[in-house]
UniProtKB/Swiss-Prot annotation:
PROSITE patterns found in the cross-reference section: RECA_1, RECA_2, RECA_3
Protein name (Swiss-Prot/TrEMBL): Protein RecA
Organism field: Acidocella facilis (Acidiphilium facile)
Gene that this polypeptide is encoded by: recA
Keywords: ATP-binding, Cytoplasm, DNA damage, DNA recombination, DNA repair, DNA-binding, Nucleotide-binding, SOS response
Function statement: Can catalyze the hydrolysis of ATP in the presence of single-stranded DNA, the ATP-dependent uptake of single-stranded DNA by duplex DNA, and the ATP-dependent hybridization of homologous single-stranded DNAs. It interacts with LexA causing its activation and leading to its autocatalytic cleavage.
UniProt-annotated binding residues for ATP: 67-74
Lineage: Bacteria, Pseudomonadati, Pseudomonadota, Alphaproteobacteria, Acetobacterales
SUPFAM superfamilies, per database record: P-loop containing nucleoside triphosphate hydrolases (SSF52540), RecA protein, C-terminal domain (SSF54752)
Amino acid sequence: MDEPGGKIEFSPAFMQIEGQFGKGAVMRAGDKPGINDPDVKSTGSLGLDGALGQGGLPRGRVVEIYGPESSGKTTLTLKAIASAQAEGATPAFTDAEHALDPGFASKLGVNVKRLLISQPDTGEQALEIADMLFRSGAVDVIVKDSVAALTPKAEIEGEMGDSHQGLHARLMSQALRNKTANISRWNKLVIFKKQIRMKMGVYGRPETTTGGNALKFYASVRLDIRRMGAMKKSATKSYDWSTRVKVVKNKVAPPFRQAELAIYYGEGIYRGSEPVDLGVKLENVEKSGGWYSYPGRRIGQGKANARQYLRVKPEFPGIFEQGIRGAMAAPHPLGFGERRDVQQESGEPYGNNG
């Protein structure tokens, strides 16, 4: 970009733009803060952090998490909040559904005394409160639960049975047009939870998400979370379930990767076997017969003993996880699934990654 005989920073056009619009109105892409060291927040799952490509959910971006009921959306967002708190961040939770249970959140590791909660009356109020919190610098992460519950004021003040066609979609479109630039400027992370609806009388997959198409376009990361099946703890009762999360859109890393999570009731995402399983998939841990080995030492015979080794060696898990994250940061890490027929499985075509 250098001009002959000098740098563009000293050209009359560049100086005029900065004088009129302020410093930073035009800059080199490589000079933007965080361009080489992305700022991310962990999801609370080592496997999902790897599937996302950069080690977590990117700050300064909008993230959408959608899926059927009881698929683990709330559990995933609360674990992300707990991870953010562990890193010193201050999160906020917009409880538009008025359904958050502080006791359940506490069991998942959330420090409820440090969690800001808002229960707005209207969708406009919810979005304005979030914007004011961002401007104050008081919070780093905001979760909006959920898009379907961000009810427009006109609908609340109207009569039951009144038609408000397109009102919700217009609210989301206007809000994202106005707020996305501020989210990037203030380097905040916004997570929208979305429910799934069924379109009537359509050919093919009838699933769709609420709130129109605006969030699909403005979100940098979209996660499709689906419950796969129950995992039994006893012969008669099922307490836990396995969940698959697909990255159907990703503007900061390669998309279409996936991770499988084990979710325990009252505990959240179970990380006990994640490091060992991922280490084997990423070829960072050697499995020979029944023995698991990490470079330089054996960590156990059988997966249970390997997990126990990580549990009783206080200095080792950090080194072990650091090695796993380093392997996940490779350009083409193994073990996170390939480009599958995302259009058929999640309802999102390949071309919707823009």
